[in-house]
Amino acid sequence: MAGWSCLVTGAGGFLGQRIVHLLAEEKELQEIRALDKAFRPELLEEFSKLQSKTKLTMVEGDILDEQCLKRACQGTSVVIHTASVIDVMNVIHRETIMNVNLKGTQLLLEACAQASVPIFIYTSTIEVAGPNSYRDIIQNAHEEEHLESTWSAPYPYSKKLAEKAVLAANGWALKNGGTLHTCALRPMYIYGEGSIFLYNYIYKALRNNGILTHHSKFSIVNPVYVGNVAWAHILALRALQDPKKAPSVQGQFYYISDDTPHQSYDDLNYNLSKEWGFSLDSRMSLPISLEYWLAFLLEIVSFLLSPIYKYQPPFNRHMVTLSNSIFTFSYKKAQRDLGYKPLFSWEEAKQKTTEWIGSLVKQHKETLKTKTH
């Protein structure tokens, strides 16, 4: 596709900025449009360095602003839609999550149809597939098993419906007479430098004398490095641009994992941070069944108090299930259809993430020094 352009939504985010960096290396790409609600000053500076490789247009706007989406899509060849509200603790209002994740996706699909954008790639999540119960054992699952989340929690529910909307839009007629082709990527839990989940977890441990709290020692999952997820998006757009590969990719979803060892979330956090003296909490944790029912009771308390007081439980049943399930997936279909293989090995991903955690430790020490002087 000569002289093509690409719009990335959520371009200022953890994954979105990696996609922008990889896009800047693509041949014949004339313009990247980076859309987000706001861009941090340091990211603006970082993106400005990419201008020497390709034209980069920053668009600050809301995914629910139809006029903004219309302008952003005009003259664009590909849309990569990563913008999303992620919330597993039910802290954010349900309506906000449903609006951004579902309505925002629907509005963007409509904007693509009006602006005749032929390719749409959606960043979904493993949570659209479950896990539905911590008792279920799902190992090396694949797309043909058609696993589906039954949770009504707003994040997995909104992402599930949005993904369905994206795949159903495959084959839509475009305003110029062309056809819209879509696909969705379902990454595992994404880790790497800049992860807000990892950032919060490490800072909590730093305030706790370097002790990493137990959340999920019973889980077995296959987390994926952020750089490999970004790479999968590039391969998906290349496949949809390739007349030979495109027919087998159109309307499909793909699990995206890599060669990170299958392990618990607790072990992942420990393996990424142990170089800096962090250690796992040696105290006994509650049995999962007890933790699950305790979460249920806290949810009932929260519901009963809701007319007079907003009580936020420290954990919920969805979180307990997510954190304590055996839930792993194969990337063979992505390998077959997209030519996907991880760009970064486990050792490289671990080194990059560990170095970043080291910078957080250093930052924390400097903050403490400032406070004591």
UniProtKB/Swiss-Prot annotation:
<protein>
    <recommendedName>
        <fullName>3 beta-hydroxysteroid dehydrogenase/Delta 5--&gt;4-isomerase</fullName>
        <ecNumber>1.1.1.145</ecNumber>
        <ecNumber>5.3.3.1</ecNumber>
    </recommendedName>
</protein>
<dbReference type="GO" id="GO:0003854">
    <property type="term" value="F:3-beta-hydroxy-Delta5-steroid dehydrogenase (NAD+) activity"/>
</dbReference>
<dbReference type="GO" id="GO:0004769">
    <property type="term" value="F:steroid Delta-isomerase activity"/>
</dbReference>
<dbReference type="GO" id="GO:0016616">
    <property type="term" value="F:oxidoreductase activity, acting on the CH-OH group of donors, NAD or NADP as acceptor"/>
</dbReference>
<feature type="binding site">
    <location>
        <position position="159"/>
    </location>
    <ligand>
        <name>NAD(+)</name>
    </ligand>
</feature>
<dbReference type="Pfam" id="PF01073">
    <property type="entry name" value="3Beta_HSD"/>
</dbReference>
<dbReference type="InterPro" id="IPR050177">
    <property type="entry name" value="Lipid_A_modif_metabolic_enz"/>
</dbReference>
<keyword id="KW-0560">Oxidoreductase</keyword>
<dbReference type="GO" id="GO:0006694">
    <property type="term" value="P:steroid biosynthetic process"/>
</dbReference>
<comment type="similarity">
    <text>Belongs to the 3-beta-HSD family.</text>
</comment>
<comment type="pathway">
    <text>Lipid metabolism; steroid biosynthesis.</text>
</comment>
<keyword id="KW-0511">Multifunctional enzyme</keyword>
<keyword id="KW-0472">Membrane</keyword>
<keyword id="KW-0755">Steroidogenesis</keyword>
<feature type="transmembrane region" description="Helical">
    <location>
        <begin position="288"/>
        <end position="308"/>
    </location>
</feature>
<keyword id="KW-1133">Transmembrane helix</keyword>
<dbReference type="GO" id="GO:0043231">
    <property type="term" value="C:intracellular membrane-bounded organelle"/>
</dbReference>
<dbReference type="GO" id="GO:0005789">
    <property type="term" value="C:endoplasmic reticulum membrane"/>
</dbReference>
<feature type="active site" description="Proton acceptor">
    <location>
        <position position="155"/>
    </location>
</feature>
<keyword id="KW-0520">NAD</keyword>
<dbReference type="GO" id="GO:0031966">
    <property type="term" value="C:mitochondrial membrane"/>
</dbReference>
<keyword id="KW-0812">Transmembrane</keyword>
<dbReference type="InterPro" id="IPR036291">
    <property type="entry name" value="NAD(P)-bd_dom_sf"/>
</dbReference>
<comment type="function">
    <text>3-beta-HSD is a bifunctional enzyme, that catalyzes the oxidative conversion of Delta(5)-ene-3-beta-hydroxy steroid, and the oxidative conversion of ketosteroids. The 3-beta-HSD enzymatic system plays a crucial role in the biosynthesis of all classes of hormonal steroids.</text>
</comment>
<dbReference type="GO" id="GO:0008207">
    <property type="term" value="P:C21-steroid hormone metabolic process"/>
</dbReference>
<dbReference type="InterPro" id="IPR002225">
    <property type="entry name" value="3Beta_OHSteriod_DH/Estase"/>
</dbReference>
<keyword id="KW-0256">Endoplasmic reticulum</keyword>
<dbReference type="GO" id="GO:0005737">
    <property type="term" value="C:cytoplasm"/>
</dbReference>
<keyword id="KW-0496">Mitochondrion</keyword>
<keyword id="KW-0413">Isomerase</keyword>
